[in-house]
Amino acid sequence: MAKLIVSDLDLKGKKVLVRVDFNVPIKNGVIGDDNRIVAALPTIKYIIEHGGKAILLSHLGRVKSDADKKELSLRPVAERLSELLKKPVTFVPENEGKEVEETIDKMKDGDVIVLENTRFQDIDNDFGKRESKNDPKLGEYWASLGDVFVNDAFGTAHRSHASNVGIATAMKKAGKPAAAGFLLEKEIKFLGDAVENPVHPFVTILGGAKVSDKIGVIENLIPKSDHILIGGGMAYTFLAAQGHKIGKSLFEADKVELAKELLAKAGDKIVLPVDNVAATEFSNDAPHEVVGDDIPDNEMGLDIGPKTVEKFRDILKDAKTVVWNGPMGAFEMPNYAEGTLEVGRALADLKDAVTIIGGGDSTAAAKQLGIAPKISHISTGGGASLNYLEGKELPGIACVSDK
């Protein structure tokens, strides 16, 4: 079912509540990476260019105490947004109450305000975690501040919070529209097409430490993928399931039987490393060597090896749809980063394919290589994109009105 999009709405003179994802790394008031702020710009600009009054809501980090409040204010985000928009942005140091209401009442068409961190509602109240547990009264209150609601926060789409599901539910109950922003629309389009209607050959690349994090993705994508390439720590659970020696490598002993079942179900679709970069300990400075698919007892696998890279490249060269989630090794250490970087290069070399990257380390690799412009879509949601690839319904998308 097609969702209502911000561009379907008449925004002139309207108070537009926008749930954005401004959950950016901040230390001592300094933003480490403003990508999520930049990703929200198309929706914000569209609203103000069409005469709407943009009222922005976001969480930032996990708020457990008053001390966290000092570190996790959205004030630096509002200042950065003002620089990016090249116009004043008003920051309101509350997200409920008289100051919020008076500031909104004074807004003119095209104005932008940022309310304080929604998760400040998770402490100092009788309900408990009002935001994270979706207190309906909080959702109703926020909904009362606006004429329309736009959800543009894919990063929290897998969570049912007051600031997404709560507002949307109250809006629809009041006969007001709840629409998707352009970022959410883009995520739905790219991930939805990949999961539901991929152009073949469709190759899934999965990495990261744990099989348990990706079980749902593998099960959902076995029937849809032509190949599933597996690297990272999770590969050693699969290699153990095949009877290979894995030395001191990270693996999940309680998931070996499950890995056997997945291998049986997938047939030859699952492709595992044929060689590995192994070291005596988990350290960049440890002696390391390339070994085959059996790892010596005193060593651990920390990256895919050069033959595996070539095998993966050979499969990828014919792909028309590629989804990549998770690193191929201990990417944070230069000596074990090459497998991840090579997979990134292979994706960048594809000319006529839809390429989608999700997950922090895969995204970081794309940025390190400078290949982001060559990738069709880099997802802004870690957990949300995994849930989508599992075929789960995401509350933050389900709550948006259908067209």
Swiss-Prot record:
GO terms for molecular function: ADP binding; ATP binding; phosphoglycerate kinase activity. The keyword ATP-binding applies. InterPro entries: Phosphoglycerate_kinase, Phosphoglycerate_kinase_CS, Phosphoglycerate_kinase_N, Phosphoglycerate_kinase_sf. Keywords: ATP-binding, Cytoplasm, Glycolysis, Kinase, Nucleotide-binding, Transferase. The keyword Amino-acid biosynthesis does not apply. ATP binds at residues 214, 301, 332, 359-362. Pfam families: PGK (PF00162). Gene3D superfamilies: Phosphoglycerate kinase, N-terminal domain. It catalyses: (2R)-3-phosphoglycerate + ATP = (2R)-3-phospho-glyceroyl phosphate + ADP. Its EC number is 2.7.2.3. It is found in: Cytoplasm. Substrate binds at residues 21-23, 36, 59-62, 119, 159. GO terms for cellular component: cytosol. Pathway: Carbohydrate degradation; glycolysis; pyruvate from D-glyceraldehyde 3-phosphate: step 2/5. It is an enzyme of class 2 (transferase). Monomer. Belongs to the phosphoglycerate kinase family. This is Phosphoglycerate kinase. It comes from Lactobacillus gasseri (strain ATCC 33323 / DSM 20243 / BCRC 14619 / CIP 102991 / JCM 1131 / KCTC 3163 / NCIMB 11718 / NCTC 13722 / AM63).
